[in-house]
């Protein structure tokens, strides 16, 4: 049996000074976008472990995305949506929501920016035009999480009322589907499958649901849910929220991070857990794989699931996956 390490990790220097809300790799790059409750949006060169640039909001930044080298988008707790071009060094206001912007996603295939807010609104923006806001959709409940598939062009939105709304981004006049979450507790995170055929949904109740877009009975029979991020403490089963999901773009397997301070790798097709990474100092707030799927960024940042209390500092760990066996699907 080989004793060679399966992964190595290091901590990014000079992390944000408050909670880390999101981490996202720029495609085909070692550059990592980090948004924070300290009102900053930062970019780190993960290979050289240095911060490259930073811009600020007037309040805590809840989400961001880095779809192309000259396109960065971010949204804050006051409803402001910003666009930053790192190549030109130019920052501009895209528009705003009436309440906090919880989720920011960009579809590179259709060149569309989507923002979802606590004001219950889904907004579609065209950053190429002077009048950037194209459409506005009232989802009648706070938006908690969104993701878009560049393969199928499906936009998936999870709301506070435990519904999931699905749009085809090429036909935004009305939603394609609206379905009740198969998990009865609050949705924390939604991420689309790498093949574009469905999505994984994480909940506060230590459970993941694997769902499919195709409404036919044959395809819907494949959906399932499983328990995770649970510990037995003093003979009691303790359930932790699952905060984030990150799909490996190369293998289609995925990682989950929870308030139990753990990150696990899963093979969804074979319904198996592949690997457990190290236990972190505190809750896992966000994760992102690079395009090649051999680097995973992990934000260890207390998510206040137990209210205000002393907690470890906010940190970002970069994992180099040295052995494909911990992330490759089971044959």
UniProtKB/Swiss-Prot annotation:
Cellular component, GO annotation: bub1-bub3 complex; kinetochore; nucleoplasm
Gene Ontology MF annotations: ubiquitin binding
WD repeat spans: 15-54, 56-94, 96-135, 138-177, 237-276, 279-327
SMART domains, per the entry: WD40
Keyword Nucleus: yes
Subcellular compartments: Nucleus
Protein name: Mitotic checkpoint protein bub3
Organism lineage: Eukaryota, Amoebozoa, Evosea, Eumycetozoa, Dictyostelia
Annotated gene: bub3
């Amino acid at each position: 049996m080989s004793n060679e390490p399966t992964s190595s990790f290091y901590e990014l220097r000079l992390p944000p000074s408050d909670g880390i809300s999101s981490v996202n790799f720029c495609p085909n790059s070692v550059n990592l976008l980090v948004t924070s409750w300290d009102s900053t949006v930062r970019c780190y060169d993960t290979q050289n472990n240095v911060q490259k640039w930073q811009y600020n909001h007037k309040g805590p930044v809840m989400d961001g995305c880095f779809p192309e080298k000259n396109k960065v988008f971010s949204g804050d707790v006051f409803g402001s949506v910003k666009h930053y071009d790192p190549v030109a060094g130019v920052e501009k206001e895209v528009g705003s929501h009436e309440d906090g912007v919880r989720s920011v996603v960009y579809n590179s295939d259709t060149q569309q920016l989507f923002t979802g807010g606590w004001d219950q609104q889904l907004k579609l923006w065209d950053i190429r035009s002077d009048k950037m806001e194209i459409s506005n959709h009232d989802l009648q409940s706070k938006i908690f999480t969104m993701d878009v598939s560049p393969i199928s062009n499906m936009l998936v939105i999870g709301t506070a009322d435990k519904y999931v709304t699905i749009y085809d981004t090429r036909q935004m006049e009305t939603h394609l589907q609206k379905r009740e979450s198969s998990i009865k507790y609050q949705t924390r995170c939604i991420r689309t499958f790498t093949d574009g055929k469905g999505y994984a949904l994480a909940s506060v109740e230590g459970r993941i649901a694997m769902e499919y877009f195709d409404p036919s009975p044959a395809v819907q029979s494949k959906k399932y849910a499983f328990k995770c991020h649970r510990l037995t403490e003093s003979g009691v089963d303790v359930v932790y929220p699952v905060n984030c999901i990150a799909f490996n773009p190369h293998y289609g397997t995925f990682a989950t991070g929870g308030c139990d301070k753990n990150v696990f790798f899963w093979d969804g097709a074979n319904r198996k857990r592949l690997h457990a990474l190290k236990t972190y100092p505190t809750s896992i707030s966000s994760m992102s794989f690079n395009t090649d799927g051999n680097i995973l960024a992990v934000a260890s940042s207390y998510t206040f699931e137990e209210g205000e209390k002393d907690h470890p500092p906010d940190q970002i760990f970069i994992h180099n996956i040295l052995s494909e066996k911990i992330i490759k699907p089971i044959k």
